[in-house]
Regions:
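Proline/Glycine/Serine-rich low-complexity intrinsically disordered segments
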Residues: 1-118
Length: 118
């Protein structure tokens, strides 16, 4: 991927651009400001690759038959996402209890699978 002939597209700011700046030294990097149309850059042949979160790769590959994941099931780095809530102990406890219950029931895995395996 990191060759002078590769055209890489990335959304501005955040962890995707940070990863690209830190690790990609030779590819042609173009920042694309619109997160809704960035995937079209690859589909229409204006970019060769995009580095993004694994969950987004799975979702977009499922929604666009012209896209596919490289190294499915593997990632370039480790990153966990979290929930940020307003400071409210009762709400926090409710959300934590709900997530714990849903995770234990297998509901979260079911939702991810349903949306990723369309």
């Amino acid at each position: 991927i990191d060759t002078t002939s590769t055209r890489l597209v990335v959304n501005p700011g955040g962890t995707n651009e940070k990863f690209v700046v830190e690790h990609i030294k030779q590819a042609k990097i173009r920042v694309h400001d619109n997160n809704r149309t960035i995937f079209d850059e690859i589909i229409k042949g204006r970019a060769d690759v995009m580095i993004t979160d694994a969950i987004e790769v799975a979702v977009q590959a499922g929604e666009h038959s012209a896209l596919c994941a490289a190294m499915p099931g593997k990632t370039l780095s480790f990153q966990e996402k979290g929930f940020l809530l307003p400071r409210d102990l009762i709400w926090q406890q409710f959300v934590n209890a709900w997530l714990t219950q849903r995770q234990g029931e297998g509901y979260l895995a079911e939702v991810f699978n349903r949306h990723l395996n369309k």
